[in-house]
Amino acid sequence: GGFYISRYNISKSSAGKPQSVKGVMPWVNINFDDAKKVASTIEDNEAVKSHLTFGAEYDSVLKWFIKTEIKTLAEIAEDSTEWGNHWSTENSPKKVVETGSREEWCANNIYDFAGNVDEWTQEQNASSFRVIRGCNFYQDGFYYPVAFRGYNNPGYFYYGTGFRATLYIK
């Protein structure tokens, strides 16, 4: 058992296949249902199965950052400005950038978790809306730290919203 979360936001290869690689634009303008479907196609064999990240998995990664002392609770729950692409980040490009663009936006070898694009998860709020985690480039990491839970209609898509995949180890 256990899981791995993708190192980079999911992007689309030149052949249209989902991938988690450095140096490409993240796959944005995708709604929840399509992100869930795409994430499930990345890997499925006798050892692992991919899926759109669950909220509990997202929380586990944040707890792992604290446990390994790579990030503090304050950097996760109060202000993620310094380790993500946010509107208020120093030298911010103020737009979505290629995955893995800056080493300071990396924690435990996971890039852009705190900013660049916010991310669909399978978590559902009290209504039928789906939870979007983290923050995107257009938001402030102080108001929307990485632990922030936004939400939207599953049919919503936006140029600042992408997703990650998780590999579940069977």
Q: For each predicted feature, which ranges?
A:
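Short hydrophobic-acidic sequence motifs that mark active-site Asp/Glu residues
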Residues: 2-4, 117, 162
